[in-house]
Swiss-Prot record:
UniProt record, GO biological process: dolichol-linked oligosaccharide biosynthetic process
Pathway: Protein modification; protein glycosylation
UniProt keyword annotation of Metal-binding present: no
InterPro entries in the record: ALG2 (IPR027054), Glyco_trans_1 (IPR001296), Glyco_trans_4-like_N (IPR028098)
TM helices/strands, residue ranges: 438-458
Descriptive protein name: Alpha-1,3/1,6-mannosyltransferase ALG2
Residues carrying a glycan: 57, 169
Organism, scientific name: Candida glabrata (strain ATCC 2001 / BCRC 20586 / JCM 3761 / NBRC 0622 / NRRL Y-65 / CBS 138) (Yeast)
Compartment list: Endoplasmic reticulum membrane
UniProt function note: Mannosylates Man(2)GlcNAc(2)-dolichol diphosphate and Man(1)GlcNAc(2)-dolichol diphosphate to form Man(3)GlcNAc(2)-dolichol diphosphate.
Gene3D superfamilies assigned to the protein according to its UniProt record, in alphabetical order: Glycogen Phosphorylase B (3.40.50.2000)
Length: 458
């Protein structure tokens, strides 16, 4: 079921940059717009030099309110100022009359504004990527105490929504454990991936990619930010234990030399390679683009068993995914995880940890049982188990190179395409429009008072 009429839909998002949450908002807005609805995004910040192309080129209508307000005070009180900026945005939208003709507001990340839109008689659908309080760092009792009012307000402001949705069943389970006072049972709307496989690879990336494939025709690929929680060492340890002949490991991902953890973790990974007697090279993508290396020098850098690449372009990432043997997706308890879908859409198999989001995206191989639907392997985060899976994957691919070619794309189109996501949004929007609130005006006003007290006192 979908809404019977075309709707006026507004998104509210704190910072319209280039992160995963922003990609979801842009995809949802595009999908609903393509379905004939009138869509606008309200945000507190949007840098046209640091945003997705659909925002930059005007395909999506975006209005910014409150960008003049600070985001912190001396690198502190980020949550306070995030709430303050959203309250300013909300006031501008409501008091200017922009909210009057909107059929529904889709709000994500911060729920502070929800009771204000409800007081203005708007319908609200809240998209919960993950409970914010579970992401907050609490290094001491002062910070823990500081977070209490924000944690409570997250729960009670979200409760004012007409409908709440989450990005995976894993997030749904965490939602239920975290928001114990909420009676809402959220539906799941999976993020989508671009199903277009005719990606244009730029000339320099094509040259770099061909040089790598020429030296390493059979390689496993790991794509993650250089952060310890991504557990990249699991891929390296399993690769060393499996000792699959004529195979290399390419590790690439986000890296900022200004971030201490990025630098330190990459050093730890190279030390691990030394301990495991694996040759390695570290290659910074920016050096390739600036022509700091000749073709011959680049080719030499790709002669090691383990090849580290930092902050590669989307173009080169697409090339590597298209040409890899297997994706090694190492993080545990990922809220969702989009990279496995990026591999599956090209018909490439995935080896992932058997918890969190990948349990919902990857269909684990079972011999003579699910060969028409399998998209890879799911194993516990144990190097021995992963090594066994690598050996098995080599055998399976040697026997049936085309096994995953159709399974991955079919699953992505059915469950994780923009069309599928749009249909789910339309279904849940209809539920929000039909929802008859049993929340009293006294409750809403009380929550608004608490929000204002929280922001201006804490």
């Amino acid at each position: 079921m979908v809404p019977a009429k075309k709707l006026k839909i507004a998104f509210v998002h704190p910072d319209l940059g280039i992160g995963g949450a922003e990609r979801l908002v842009v995809d949802a807005a595009l999908g609903l717009q393509e379905a004939g609805h009138e869509v606008i995004i309200y945000t507190s910040h949007c840098d046209k030099t640091h945003c997705f192309e659909e925002v930059k080129n005007g395909t999506l209508k975006v209005e910014v309110f409150g960008d003049f307000l600070p985001t912190d005070l001396g690198k502190r009180f980020f949550i306070v100022f995030a709430n303050l900026r959203q309250l300013y945005l909300t006031a501008k939208v409501v008091l200017s009359g922009r909210s009057k003709d909107k059929d529904v507001f889709i709000i994500d990340q911060l729920s502070t504004c929800v009771p204000f839109f409800k007081l203005a008689n708007n319908k609200v659908l809240f998209y919960c990527h993950f409970p914010d309080q579970l992401l907050a760092i609490r290094t001491n009792w002062i910070k823990s105490l500081y977070r209490i009012p924000f944690d409570l307000l997250e729960q009670f402001t979200m409760y004012c929504s007409d409908e709440v949705v989450v990005n995976s069943n894993f997030t749904k389970s965490m939602y239920k454990k975290t928001f114990k006072y909420l009676q809402k049972n959220p539906n799941v709307i999976y993020p989508c991936v671009d199903t277009d496989t005719e990606t244009l690879i730029n000339d320099r990336d094509m040259q770099i990619g061909n040089l790598l494939v020429g030296k390493c025709p059979n390689f496993y690929l790991s794509i993650n930010r250089y952060e310890r929680k991504k557990n990249i060492e699991l891929a390296i340890q399993a690769f060393a234990k499996a000792s699959v002949e004529n195979t290399n490991l390419v590790v690439c991902g986000g890296y900022d030399p200004r971030i201490h953890e990025n630098v330190q973790y990459l050093q730890e990974l190279t030390c691990l390679c030394k301990e495991l007697d694996l040759s390695y090279t570290v290659n910074h993508y920016s050096d390739f683009i600036e022509d700091s290396y000749s073709v011959n020098e680049i080719e030499k850098l790709f002669g090691a068993k383990v090849i580290f690449l930092t902050s590669i372009s989307s173009s080169l990432k697409e090339f590597l995914i298209q040409n890899m043997q297997l994706l090694l997706y190492t993080p545990s308890y990922e809220h969702f995880g989009i990279v496995p879908l990026e591999a599956m859409k090209y018909g490439k198999p995935v080896l992932a940890v058997n918890n969190g989001g990948p349990v919902e995206t990857v269909v684990s191989y079972q011999k003579e049982d699910n060969e028409k639907s399998t998209t890879g392997w799911l194993r516990s985060a144990d190097a021995d188990e992963w090594a066994s899976a690598l050996i098995e994957s080599k055998e399976v691919l040697n026997q049936n190179p085309e096994l995953f070619k159709n399974n991955g794309p079919k699953r992505v189109i059915e469950l994780f395409s923009r069309k599928a996501m749009t249909q789910e949004f339309e279904t849940n929007i209809k539920l929000a429009l039909r929802h008859t609130s049993n929340i009293s005006i006294i409750y809403v006003v009380s929550i608004i008072f608490a929000v204002l007290l929280k922001v201006f006192v804490f």
